């Protein structure tokens, strides 16, 4: 099946044809580091991590850029309110964002430029727009420079709006505009703002406008044209509309695809700081492991609204428990499979490293139905259905002692988990190789002792060992191929 994505600009699902064969260039909007991250930021980053992983799986060499907006009206206002330096506040929250991303196993981008590190590129873009008649310095001497929206006939094409129906640009204290919808490319310094938050320019000391920052950084790292621009649905207008307008007005084709992820709701209600229902990473990770959180954030179609509730994390944990239970039982059985062609025992790489085989994922074993789902506008819900159906089939293979079929299902599940980024994070059962290897050694010793008791028909001793392990949270399951074990998951409240 051809790889296809929904393009916001054309409002249709289109075949993905990269600008350069075999390569895919992506830019997605990172954080404005004014305060701590929340669940919406995490979902957006995760969606584009899934996209990047899938493009790589399909053989594309990816170049990913995610910006950091480290200078902005809100950053200045909140820093002043808190009595701290704006740059210190920005850096502090940038680190918090990265820590949350890392915890979720979100791959770092190839480039992560800060707005403050690309001022000269912004000056060049502004001057180009002025020279082309699409921007103008404010006539009041304020140092502001604005984009002239009526000079660009395609303004509104991304969000399919008529210019006269649009809201006024929400620039703080706008000065000297021709049209209320004109937006700031450069903001002249105001007397109450710190001198450290301004840079010299041909139009006077000041700082860049938010929309301009992204266009300049895209041009620097990906060139005038690139494959995919991504971000949250709330960024379509005005941010992405303005990005596209100013870039194309400067003669840059810009993005070939625009992809937007849906927002996160709280039990059906829009999340809002004023309501007090915004969920941060600290609260999420207190309720569930990073792997469970990743499963939850990534399980819905990326364009749909994701609804949050404590129960949704419990459901995600239960879904992963079913997968992990299969892997534990299958791992013990798969090691017994003799590979017919080679005549030696099949053993997954690192299988002797406790749960090391969670990281084993031969991509060639990914089921065709899974590939078709992911190719179809990154349909993760459908792909997860394939994953869970494979788990069910694998459990049936265990029950029927069909070890050859079990091996196939085992490899397929590992492959799908790897693609979804669910095998790259330490599992709840395996925080690190050292501790899990020790745990497995201890449990296996007890199981051997139990098996000896069963051989001697000492059923009381066998049950006693089983009960002792159960008390420690170890669940034992007996089958014709021997006993297997897993950690009994407790519901997190």
Curated annotation (Swiss-Prot):
SUPFAM superfamilies: Anticodon-binding domain of a subclass of class I aminoacyl-tRNA synthetases, Nucleotidylyl transferase
CDD domains: CysRS_core
Subcellular localization, as worded in the UniProt entry: Cytoplasm
UniProt keyword Flavoprotein, yes or no: no
Annotated motif 'KMSKS' region, positions: 270-274
Reactions catalysed: tRNA(Cys) + L-cysteine + ATP = L-cysteinyl-tRNA(Cys) + AMP + diphosphate
Cofactor-binding details, from the entry: Binds 1 zinc ion per subunit.
GO MF annotation: an example: ATP binding
Name of the top EC class for this enzyme: ligase
Primary localization class, coarse: cytoplasm
Gene Ontology BP annotations: cysteinyl-tRNA aminoacylation
Cofactor(s) needed by this chain: Zn(2+)
This enzyme's EC code(s): 6.1.1.16
Residues reported to bind ATP: 273
Record-listed Zn(2+) binding positions: 29, 214, 239, 243
Pfam families: CysS_C, DALR_2, tRNA-synt_1e
Annotated motif 'HIGH' region, positions: 31-41
Sorted UniProt keywords: Aminoacyl-tRNA synthetase, ATP-binding, Cytoplasm, Ligase, Metal-binding, Nucleotide-binding, Protein biosynthesis, Zinc
GO annotation, cellular component aspect: cytosol
Family stated for the protein in its record: Belongs to the class-I aminoacyl-tRNA synthetase family.
Subunit architecture: Monomer.
Name of the protein in question: Cysteine--tRNA ligase
